[in-house]
Amino acid sequence: MSMDEKELINIWNQQRVIRVKSQLAPTVLLSAVLALAATGNLNSSTDSTLKLFVIGLVASGGVFSVTAMLAAIEDSLSVVKALKKLKSVSAVGAGIIGAAPRLKILGGLFVLMSGFNFVVLLAYL
């Protein structure tokens, strides 16, 4: 099944929304953990059960966030692949095709930053 450029751009835009929305809950979660740490309510002397809960919550939120982000990037790269097969594309289509390398970099950086944040949390607690 082949799609025209307009359909592919609509799919691209849907994936963009997913990439953004997939980060809302983890951002709120990390903000709450940071607020607890900054106010001294979450530190090395905090009850170990609460620390394990926070670590588990952040880890599971991170896994879901990374999974959603990588899936959206993969779907977006499929759109790029389909756009490249079209005989001609508009400036918008060309811009989307040009975004492919940045998406790959974004995916790699996102995984690294997520891992870094988790390691820092573990070290702090």
Which role does the model predict for each range below?
Residues 42-82:
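Short alpha-helical packing/oligomerization segments
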Residues 29-34, 108-115:
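Core segments of transmembrane alpha-helices
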Residues 1-42:
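Cytosol/matrix-facing amphipathic helices and coiled-coil assembly/linker segments
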Residues 116-125:
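Juxtamembrane boundary at the C-terminal end of a transmembrane helix
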Residues 4, 8-15, 80-104:
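Short membrane-interface loop/juxtamembrane segments of multi-pass integral membrane proteins
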Residues 35-55, 91-103:
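Cytoplasmic juxtamembrane interface segments
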Residues 14-29, 65-79, 99, 103:
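Charged, low-complexity, helix-prone segments enriched in Lys/Glu/Asp/Gln
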Residues 22-25, 49-63, 102-112:
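Alpha-helical transmembrane segments
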